[in-house]
Amino acid sequence: MTIKKGIYAASMSVFKDDLSLDANSYRIRVGHTIVAQDKVYVDRKLAMPSDETQLKIQGIQVKDPTFGLESIWIEQHLVSKAEANHYMIIEPEAVIATHLNNILLRYSGDLISQDDVQSLLDNLGKSNPQLIQSVVPKLVPLHHLTIILRNLLVERVPINDLKKILEALTNLSERKLSPEELSEAVRPAISSLLIQKISNINESLNVVTFNPEFEQMLIAMSKKSGSEGILIDPELVL
């Protein structure tokens, strides 16, 4: 299964004999860790109201598992009535598929391994052998590259253009940066991919900028805090 972020999801297993689950319930695990749990009703449809919906349809009221929006599991004979009242109707299997896809995107940083990264390098090496040979492991060890890609994925930064990422790492190799610092430093090289996620090519993109002094203060705080995030002094007055 391919994820649009540029990695392949590991194989998935489906277990139907978990006696600890209630009827109609399902769980999603990453490794042995339960990361999500919800219910689907295979004999019903999930109806999600829109802004134009006025009539309330009878059914099992829930929040959809992916986005937490108010929804109703309705019986089949109410589908036409719901559609006429501007409900969006979703099949139960689509509910699970959307939830699973969201989990894969959210936990993609946990899913990618050194073997996965090596597979990505092998694939890229077919068209760019010299680039691979000059970067990994000469400039960046495989385990460091894995950390860098994990960091990007955790922040939902796509790694589709691995070639650009490696080229950026080549230019940064002399700066003796940690994997965390390299993760941040490669962002400008893939800025076009980041922008494409939030804006079409012909659209204007509204941005918010900080005062240069405040920005430098945040950068300094980030370096001091490390992997714990940015720790801002509560006494700070802007």
Task: Locate predicted features.
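Membrane-embedded alpha-helical signal segments
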Residues: M1-L238
